[in-house]
From Swiss-Prot:
GO biological process annotation, one example: monoatomic ion transport
Intramembrane region list: 238-258
Similarity comment text for this entry: Belongs to the ACDP family.
Role according to the record: Probable metal transporter.
Segments on the Cytoplasmic face: 197-237, 259-261, 314-769
One GO location term (cellular component): plasma membrane
The name this protein goes by in its record: Metal transporter CNNM4
Keywords: CBS domain, Cell membrane, Glycoprotein, Ion transport, Membrane, Repeat, Transmembrane, Transmembrane helix, Transport
Bias (Basic and acidic residues): 732-746
UniProt gene name: cnnm4
Location of the CBS domain: 374-435, 442-508
Source organism (scientific name): Xenopus tropicalis (Western clawed frog)
Record-annotated membrane-spanning stretches: 176-196, 262-282, 293-313
Length: 769
């Protein structure tokens, strides 16, 4: 506080006042003649300390509150401890003619102590006066007191009526509300300040797009919260204005209450700052930044109330913001930002690597062209238009594994047609049908795309069902002459899908894992190689089609136990079938049907060979009753003739295959029942292990059959053992795995009864036919 000094002395008094008084000092009375030096002289005072509010008025008066305890610093000369009697205050009414004199000092201001201190002037020049201000009377709101001073007892008193000598006592302002109620209101305001601050961050941070996403794919609780918040959040600027206006209003009211409750000064500043910053900003914003959805949904009723209360101010401002800034759309990610967001949040989103690859491939689909994923024309499997659909060509098609094969004419870049593998369902390789005949008949349309076509456009074309294979071409304008279309390669639906899933799709026919890296696929061990069945010059004396050779090989390997892969390897069996004189033909003698050359087996004659009928029909006569029946292709005889006696288990002269069972049901029942009962006995084998047939097999027409002798079969067994089992250091070989368990001998009387039973069934079936 500061106060101007009023000078009531001459030149000496003013000089002393300028030298001795600080800014808040008051000048005392002036005199016309110098005073004795030994008498005390009071020059002025200033406020040193007050336990309640005190201030200077605009007129320079010192204003204090009733009930205050003041400490005044008094300045003067020759002050002593007993100088308190020369200082007094009396009531003063400005503008009144009849004011009280200094002798009538006021009892409302009680002087309790005077402490004198030496300030270095050679005499005591300052003193501390403690002054107690008593409460005002009920009818008064303020009262003015003036300073009265004297030089000593019996000397006159001087009344200081200037502003610097006046002291105004004001009525203490009592709060409108009790302190406990103010504390409660402050607590509520702090809570509201925190709510508004938190909602301002929590609700405004909830993007409208994000709320729509949560409504569709969040948890049930999140969906419920988002459904509540989304209508309010849609009014973004209105919500923002309401929250900010409410926050400012609450903080302003809170500051005013704290100032009234605590008082002005550093304490009020620290209290309001601490309460608003810590409880109204930091804590709620930290909470709402992580749980804004739940907090916003549970306090939505309060938000709506404040939006309604602040409507007259907030709504017009929000409309101005809408017009100036436009409608709030929300955060929208483009393809690149969305992909990067997924990559950054991958450790926390629970998306596995394979799913991330699929998402990345789908997002990058529109950025890649056909040229990036196509198979170059030189790496494509194609067929020339003049090809013939024989066994070799069909085998190449089957080995390639492709279902759609381009057909070119003259050069590979000139693709004129396309062949579907399903078109070959009714094509017989023996017919050697020209490829052009099949392609002209089906006439599949060709689908061309340019090399710069995006993969999403190609995928849409493939989805229409026109074709799953497209020919990639470009316009070649290099060199002289007119531009022309140049074929660059092929693209399939599989290529597009591989780019989407970011992984290679390998099937059993793929040769490379990637068309660009040319990394070969590890060949499967069980993959069938049909090239070994192709025709070779001078390899077979009797002409047999490759497909029939393949069928015979499969039948012997799977249906005849003696030729099972455990005994005879498939490679050895194939070499055996290609051995000279194994596949033979018999031309039927029409003139003499009973001629010996028409018989494959004759009763009671030694036979050391196995026969498999490939084409034609034979008549089998077996049993004591000479029962006869006919058999066709893929029936076999003489299993015991090539087998050793100890391993003999199949003694039927005729065994019908599953290939022959589809001819007719009656034929199946007849042949199967007969073949299961015709058997020999161990007495048929001589001591030299010779086999004597107890049945006859006679041709009924031209035949083509496989004939394997015992010597050839034993050689095949030995070759298979050498191929599958390395020799031991002692030179021995591992014994073959006996997968065929030896069966007990079938007694002759049991065989006879079975033959009689089958005989009667055959007679009934024959009569029915």
């Amino acid at each position: 506080m500061a106060a101007s000094a009023g000078c009531y002395y001459g030149v000496l008094g003013c000089a002393l006042s300028l030298l001795l008084l600080p800014p808040l000092s008051r000048c005392a009375a002036r005199t016309d003649s110098p005073l004795p030096e030994e008498l005390p002289l009071i020059l002025g005072f200033r406020l040193e300390r007050s336990d309640r509010h005190a201030a200077l008025s605009p007129d320079g008066e010192l204003e204090v509150v009733e009930g205050s305890r003041l400490e005044l610093r008094v300045y003067g000369l020759h002050l002593r401890e007993d100088s308190g009697h020369i200082l007094a205050f009396t009531e003063y009414s400005p503008g009144s003619q009849d004011n009280r004199s200094c002798l009538e000092d006021s009892r409302d201001l009680v002087l309790t102590r005077l402490n004198v201190s030496d300030d270095g002037f050679g005499a005591a020049g300052a003193a501390i006066v403690r002054l107690d201000v008593l409460p005002l009377r009920k009818s008064q709101s303020s009262r003015v007191y003036v300073l009265c001073t004297s030089r000593g007892p019996g000397l006159p008193w001087k009344l200081h009526t200037g502003p610097d000598g006046r002291l105004r006592v004001l009525e203490e302002e009592k709060p409108l509300l009790p302190i406990w109620l103010q504390a409660c209101i402050i607590a509520v305001l702090l809570t509201l300040s925190g709510i508004f601050s938190g909602l301002n961050l929590g609700l405004m941070a909830l993007d409208p797009m994000e709320l729509r996403v949560v409504q569709r794919c969040g948890t049930e609780k999140e969906k419920r919260y988002a459904s509540k918040i989304e209508p309010v959040r849609r009014k973004g600027n209105y919500l923002l204005c309401s929250l900010l206006l409410g926050n400012v209003l609450v903080n302003t009211t809170l500051t005013a209450l704290l100032d009234e409750l605590i008082g002005s000064g550093l304490a009020a500043v620290l209290a309001s700052t601490t309460g608003i910053v810590v409880l109204g900003e930091i804590v709620p914003q930290a909470l709402c930044s992580r749980h804004g959805l739940a907090v916003g949904a549970n306090t939505l009723w309060l938000t709506r109330i404040f939006m309604l209360l602040t409507f007259p101010v907030a709504y017009p401002v929000s409309r101005l913001l809408d017009c100036a800034l436009g409608q709030e759309i929300g955060t929208v990610y483009n393809r690149e930002k969305l992909l990067e967001m997924l990559k950054v949040t991958e450790p926390y989103s629970g998306i596995v690597r394979e799913e991330m690859n699929i998402i990345q491939g789908a997002l990058e689909l529109r950025t890649k062209t056909v040229e990036d994923v196509m198979t170059k024309v030189e790496d494509c499997f194609m067929l020339p238009s003049d090809a013939v659909l024989d066994f070799n060509t069909m085998s190449s098609i089957m080995e390639s594994g492709y279902t759609r094969i381009p057909v070119y004419e003259n050069e590979r870049s000139n693709i004129v047609d396309i062949l579907y593998v399903k078109d070959l369902a009714f094509v017989d390789p023996d017919d050697c049908t020209p490829l052009s005949t099949i392609t002209r008949f089906y006439s599949h349309p060709l689908h061309f795309v340019f090399s710069d076509t995006k993969l999403d456009a190609v995928l849409e074309e493939f989805k229409k069902g026109k074709s799953h294979l497209a020919i990639v071409q470009k316009v070649n304008s290099e060199g002289e002459g007119d531009p022309f279309y140049e074929v660059m390669g092929l693209v399939t639906l599989e290529d597009v899908i591989e780019e989407i899933i970011k992984s290679e799709i390998l099937d059993e026919s793929d040769l490379y894992t990637d068309n660009r890296s040319k990394k070969r696929v590890k060949r499967r061990q069980d993959r069938k190689d049909f090239s070994v069945f192709k025709d070779a010059d001078n390899e077979l004396r009797v002409k047999i089609s490759p497909q029939l050779l393949l069928a015979a090989h499969r039948f012997l390997s799977t249906e005849v136990p003696l030729f099972a892969p455990a005994l005879v390897s498939e490679k050895t069996l194939l070499r055996l079938l290609k051995y000279p004189d194994v596949v033979q033909e018999l031309h039927f003698n029409e003139d003499d049907k009973k001629a010996s050359e028409n018989f494959l087996y004759q009763r009671s004659k030694i036979a050391d060979y196995f026969i498999l009928i490939l084409q034609g029909k034979v008549e089998v006569e077996a049993g004591k009753e000479n029962m006869k029946f006919e058999s066709g292709a893929f029936s076999y005889y003489g299993v015991m003739a090539i087998n050793t006696p100890s391993a003999a288990e199949l003694r039927s002269p005729s065994h019908m295959s599953s290939l022959n069972r589809s001819i007719s049901l009656s034929c199946h029942e007849r042949s199967d029942s007969i073949s299961s009962t015709i058997s020999g006995s161990n007495t048929q084998l001589s001591a030299q292990a010779q086999y004597m047939a107890d049945f006859s097999v006679r041709a009924l027409g031209d035949l083509q059959f496989v004939k394997i002798t015992r010597e050839q079969y034993q050689g095949a067994l030995m070759s298979s053992r050498l191929d599958s089992s390395p020799q031991s250091p002692e030179g021995g070989t591992r014994k073959p795995d006996s997968t065929l368990s030896e069966r007990s001998e079938v007694l002759e009387d049991e065989t006879t009864s079975l033959l009689n039973q089958r005989n009667s069934q055959h007679s009934l079936q024959h009569n029915a036919v």
